[in-house]
């Protein structure tokens, strides 16, 4: 009987994980479509570089603020509705964006709205996985949709290569609408079968106990710092990677773009590396994160002394891999571990909000810092960020149990 139970748990986890992973892939295709089609849009004269920068900033901040708001709402509303309607409304906004390209204000509003609706997905995804699977399967399911997010960038790039930019946004819109509809249907079916049950394994904090205090007891401050430093590397550093390849390593623009695509494709395996190493370390999350940050710190320091272009790229990948592994384990292990508090979506949305605000700020600072202190100085700053990760990961307090 126990064996049959385990098989049933695994099957249910696979169903949930697959549905969430495919849904999140649609989210990241949509998120990265503007970046992937920037060259086409510029050549077509649809938007200027200034317009594209404004669009990117509007999206970035609406997504970040939306994570905070929708994370809180996600603990009050069924994940089925948050995820499904978030995907559907984002799909409508993507379609409107390409249709309103000749009307800048309407285009800005529709694209910004897309960011807000896409922020409805991640917190509820984490919540539904955490509350309906065991901790081991929750980690593996979370890794599955983290992997989906990492392959979203090259997938968006592939779509952009194959079709014109307006069509690319229509493809993105179609995938969001399709996945939103499928999620609504599939979640309803899984609810009827008892595979998804709202509030499973949740132990609500006593009414007289402050929710902030509950999260403080679960190391939310530590993971706030981790979210900040990994968010900067995951988003801002990776964003400036093509410029680094072109200016510091002297690759041509075309070669830098190709290498960037290759590097981001390699980084897609990060979530797999994170979960396997976590398992190998006997599911000791604190030790795993400490090792990841230590590797990343050493790699960034080494980067300043490696002059050979190919070796330099390899060391850069190692540095990014270490940081992204720590980031992946935070989303796939720490956030689901809050299933018994009833605050999974709130905490996830908060951490994502902090991550993106930090990345937005850093992305604006980095080009000025590069001009002031050069690439070597900027690399030293990146190493310093990872060293902060090492410091907060040291066992100052009792280790957080993995299970």
Give the residues covered by each predicted segment.
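Helix-to-loop junctions at the C-terminal end of transmembrane segments
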Residues: 66-78, 271-284, 370
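A late C-terminal transmembrane helix in Major Facilitator Superfamily
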Residues: 338-373
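Conserved MFS/SLC helix-loop-helix module at the cytosolic interface between two early adjacent transmembrane helices
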Residues: 65-103
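Cytoplasmic helix-loop-helix junction between adjacent transmembrane helices
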Residues: 110-148
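Juxtamembrane intracellular "pre-TM" segments in multi-pass secondary transporters
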Residues: 2-9, 191-223
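Helix-loop-helix hairpin linking two adjacent transmembrane segments in secondary transporters
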Residues: 145-191
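C-terminal transmembrane helical hairpin of 12-TM major facilitator-type secondary transporters
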Residues: 284-330
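Extracytoplasmic gate region of multi-pass secondary transporters
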Residues: 34-35, 218-272
């Amino acid at each position: 009987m126990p064996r049959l139970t385990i098989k049933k748990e695994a099957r249910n986890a696979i169903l949930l994980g697959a549905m969430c992973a495919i849904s999140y892939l649609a989210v990241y295709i949509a998120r990265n479509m503007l970046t992937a089609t920037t060259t086409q849009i510029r050549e077509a004269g649809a938007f200027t570089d200034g317009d594209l920068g404004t669009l990117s900033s509007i999206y970035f901040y609406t997504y970040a603020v939306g994570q905070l708001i929708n994370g809180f709402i996600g603990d009050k509303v069924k994940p089925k509705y948050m995820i499904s309607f978030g995907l559907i409304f984002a799909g409508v906004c993507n379609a409107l964006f390409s249709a309103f390209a000749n009307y800048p204000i309407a285009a800005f509003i529709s694209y910004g709205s897309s960011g807000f609706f896409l922020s409805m997905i991640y917190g509820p995804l984490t919540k539904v996985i955490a509350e309906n699977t065991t901790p081991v399967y929750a980690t593996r399911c979370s890794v599955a949709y983290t992997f989906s997010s990492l392959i979203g960038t090259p997938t968006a790039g592939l779509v952009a290569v194959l079709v014109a930019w307006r069509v690319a946004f229509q493809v993105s819109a179609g995938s969001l609408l399709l996945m939103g509809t499928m999620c609504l249907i599939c979640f309803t079916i899984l609810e009827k079968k008892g595979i998804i049950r709202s509030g499973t394994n949740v132990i609500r904090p006593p009414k007289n106990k402050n929710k902030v205090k509950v999260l403080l007891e679960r190391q939310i401050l530590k993971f706030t710092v981790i979210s900040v430093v990994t968010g900067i590397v995951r988003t801002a550093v990776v964003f400036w990677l093509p410029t680094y390849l072109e200016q510091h390593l002297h690759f041509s623009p075309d070669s830098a773009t190709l290498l960037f695509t290759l590097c981001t494709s390699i980084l897609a395996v990060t979530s797999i590396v994170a979960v396997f190493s976590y398992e190998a370390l006997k599911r000791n999350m604190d030790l795993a994160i400490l090792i990841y940050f230590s590797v990343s710190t050493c790699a960034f320091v080494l980067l300043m002394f490696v002059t050979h272009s190919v070796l330099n790229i390899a060391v850069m990948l190692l540095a990014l891999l270490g940081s992204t592994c720590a980031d992946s384990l935070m989303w796939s292990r720490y956030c689901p571990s809050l299933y018994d508090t009833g605050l999974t979506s709130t905490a996830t949305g908060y951490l994502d909000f902090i991550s993106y605000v930090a990345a937005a700020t850093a992305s604006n600072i980095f080009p000025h810092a590069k001009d002031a202190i050069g690439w070597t100085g900027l690399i030293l700053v990146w190493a310093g960020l990872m060293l902060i990760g090492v410091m907060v990961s040291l066992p100052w307090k009792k280790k957080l149990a993995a299970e």
